[in-house]
Structures are given as C-alpha cells and as structure tokens.
Amino acid sequence: MALQQDIIEALGVKPTIDADEEIRISVDFLKSYLKRYPFLKSLVLGISGGQDSTLTGKLCQMAMTELRAESGDSDYQFIAVRLPHGVQADEQDCQDAITFIQPDRVLTVNIKAAVQASEQALREAGITLSDFIRGNEKARERMKVQYSIAGMNAGVVVGTDHAAEAVTGFFTKYGDGGTDINPIFRLNKGQGKRLLNALGCPEHLWLKHPTADLEDDRPGLQDEVALGVTYEMIDRYLQGESIDPAAAKIIEGWYVKTEHKRRTPITVFDDFWKK
C-alpha cells in the first residue's frame, strides 16, 4: 500500500475527475507554456488514430485556436503528423481522428524507408535487429521526424504519456517517451476516455483496444496482452483502490523495472537505482 500511494502521488492521479475541468486544465497548461516562451509558435504531435493521440491532438488544437483569438497572432498553429510505417492497418481510424481534431496543418511522413535504411546500415555493421528492437527503431524514427518538424516551425513536440502508461513504462525511451510537454500526464486510461466523451469524440476511437503496433511478428498486439494486466486494473490501482494482489504485483514490478525511463539520464548524484 505504501508503494501504491507513492506511485499515485508521483504521477498526480486523482481518484475522481470532472472532465470539463480537466480539459480546461490541459488547454490552459499548453497556452501558458507558449505564452511564457513567445518565440514558440507551434505544437507538433504524431496522430496514430488511438485514444491518447486523439485526445492530446484535440487539446492542442483547442489551445492554439484560443491563443490565436486572444493574442491576434495568426502564427500560432497545431501541426498534426501522420507517421505510418508502410500502410497502417487502422488508417481509417487515423483519418477519423483527424476529422475530429480539425488540425491547422496535417503532414504525412512515411517512416518505412528510413527505418529500413537504418536497419540495413546496422546489418552492414554486424548488428541484426530483433523484431522488438525494430519496433523501438520505429518509435524513435517517428520522434526524430517530429523534432525536425518542430525545429523548422518554432515548435515544441507534444507527448501523449498518461498515468496508466507512465506507471508501467509502456513507451519507448527517446521514442514516444522523448517529448517536450505532456498535457495529459496526470490522467489514467479511463479518465482519458471521459474527456474524449465530453469533447464529442466518435466512440470507436476511444473504445478500441489500445495497441502500440510496433512489432512486425505480432501486428496489432494489444497493450494489455503485452503488459499482462488490464487498463481497468491499472486505473483502479492508480485511483487508490485495493485490487487483486497478483495484478498489483505486476503493476509495481513494471514501475520499479522502468524507473529509468521516467528520469533524465543517470548521473553520479542519482541513487534510485541502488534501492
């Protein structure tokens, strides 16, 4: 129970939320950051067609629309980036997400050729990637592209990390975890669904089974299968409820194992890894 409380406090999860209030918190958070650094003019986010990027994208667009109206500065823009690896199986969901979000700009960069070129260069150096590591390569290529776009548009890269993902470390280090700002960090999975419902998002985008879809050998592998625990159980844990001890052990095991992912590079002054 002590570790559970430490985790809840570290991730800032509330046991109950008001969806409209949380929407306003996230939008104002994004706006205040850009106001603090007026040389920044854009928010850049990869859109996958899943719950998290759909929610984050909508919040980004709301923030930029309000900033333009409040400041009179038409340079503020939200750039949604489609980053398929070849042909994406749920491409229609991606298009539905774009239709819902209505981004200022939509860019599409297919990462397949870049990933294959990197894999070939490594192969020539004697390194053959496993399917799992190739999946990480895809995630990092996507983030590289987003930073290039942000760099050319006075922008910041927005992340989709939320509490149910952070607690398990279910993201690629310096891939989808390598962002500038994370506006939904404090929310668990179910709370994110509530925000999308309040925003009028099509149900199929937040009722679908979450998948990172990074592995070629296991396409569409559901998050809950990879983690060995359901998001419902993770959400209940993060809300301070007592859950099945076996599920709690899995969640806490992921949390401890992936601590390094939630920190900046380790220095001689860090000691968390010794505990």
Curated annotation (Swiss-Prot):
Q: In which pathway does it act?
A: Cofactor biosynthesis; NAD(+) biosynthesis; NAD(+) from deamido-NAD(+) (ammonia route): step 1/1
Q: Which positions bind ATP?
A: 46-53, 160, 189, 211
Q: Which superkingdom, per the lineage? A: Bacteria
Q: Which reaction does it catalyse?
A: deamido-NAD(+) + NH4(+) + ATP = AMP + diphosphate + NAD(+) + H(+)
CC terms in the record's Gene Ontology section? cytoplasm
**Please, one GO biological process term?**
NAD biosynthetic process
Binding, Mg(2+) = 52, 165
Which residues participate in deamido-NAD(+) binding?
A: 140, 173, 180, 260-261
Its Enzyme Commission number(s) read 6.3.1.5
Q: Which GO terms describe its molecular function?
A: ATP binding; glutaminase activity; metal ion binding; NAD+ synthase (glutamine-hydrolyzing) activity; NAD+ synthase activity
Subunit details for this protein?
Answer: Homodimer.
The identity of this protein, by name, is NH(3)-dependent NAD(+) synthetase
